[in-house]
């Protein structure tokens, strides 16, 4: 976590299990686990890709310190997180100081238990060397090299393992002065036994100074740089640093973030957290939330006394936990299709549709009166034959409120932003909620959509021609409360000019 915190071990009482949350994202109906789907991860042009070269975003949760809340780290809880929350990555936080590994090296056995569970469940796992009060990673560099030599020797051939070698350097420790030299040595230790699994390196000022790392990157091609934030404390300046680092070709991983302030206890700050999550999803940045614990603090995911083995009801989740679960589930079928969200039927199922296309929509922006419409769509082929994406036209209907022109941007596309073309048009019959539409089409480079496949997220941002604020509540295609993907018939899809999905205004 970002700052030192009082660590209070709470006596756990097992709550009575009542109605289980929602419908689990059951893996019994899936053909593959996340690791089976994506395999060996690597870095390509500063972005995380899978073994097919396809960009992937990891989303998950971190344990709290194993010395205090290690009982929550087990196969049953991790299976529940995979199946119900939709995680594709779990972070096991092994503190070094504060009664951690340095004084209690047996904690490494809990790390091994977590890795074995992740291997069995087919999810990625981050082995976190959690420096914090020991602000300079060089203090325990010798122990770090011994530990990671063992881990790399054990798991060098396991594609789901990720090494995080310095959680949060702080206290005046800088990238060039202390962190980079340390990382060079520990990376060499790992690479002597594991040539290619990802390595995450913390940055200065509690893993905020990614700009320094971006300006002097490590030579290892599969290294990522950690940024940590707490939504109640950290804002736009850190998002700007992510943009800067990515512009320099540095691969960024938000390996820890919280809905609270930096103390871990103020909040939760959910609007600020949503702004962050939208941003990270826009940029394709992987993220892990802090933390899986029932500790009495705002950033804890569980309510006091929650079961240590999963099966959590809504009453077992904290406010933060409910929010984080929703965010992970909302993105669970994006960036690689790890687990599908529970489908919902369109408003008028079948009305106006003639083909085998389903369009899902989510509202990316919770402010309907700011300066942009931010929407995301995902298209599925539910038929038995391939669909050529360049034959499809997606229409998002809105009312321009008398403002001419439009400025259009593709913020993210799983098929590649360069394969998305946007323009505006006018419907045959204007209404008080639709006198224009944004047309989203695919270039030939997007390829075809095979039966049962989906495009993944395509995210489009629409500004008025004069950059003034908009009024989305007056737009036909707008869904104010559709913050998770749902089948949405107020956005239409045409295939070679024929309406195959949705209801025109």
Swiss-Prot record:
* Gene3D superfamilies (UniProt xref): Endoglucanase-like, Glycosidases
Question: According to its UniProt record, which residues of this chain constitute the active site?
Answer: 168 (proton donor), 256 (nucleophile)
**Reaction(s) the record says it catalyses:** Endohydrolysis of (1->4)-beta-D-glucosidic linkages in cellulose, lichenin and cereal beta-D-glucans
Q: Where is this chain compositionally biased, Low complexity type?
A: 339-355
Annotated InterPro entries: CBM2/CBM3_carb-bd_dom_sf (IPR008965), CBM3 (IPR001956), CBM3_sf (IPR036966), Glyco_hydro_5 (IPR001547), Glyco_hydro_5_CS (IPR018087), Glycoside_hydrolase_SF (IPR017853)
Q: What is its main location?
A: secreted
| Region (Disordered), start-end ranges | 332-355
Q: Where is the signal peptide?
A: 1-31
Return one GO MF term.
cellulose binding
Instruction: Extract the ranges annotated as region (Catalytic).
Output: 32-334
Q: Indicate which residues the UniProt annotation says bind substrate.
A: 64, 68-69, 95, 130, 230, 262-263, 290, 295-297
Task: Give the UniProt family note.
Answer: Belongs to the glycosyl hydrolase 5 (cellulase A) family.
- What is the protein's given name? Endoglucanase 5
Organism name? Pectobacterium carotovorum subsp. carotovorum (Erwinia carotovora subsp. carotovora)
Gene of this entry: celV
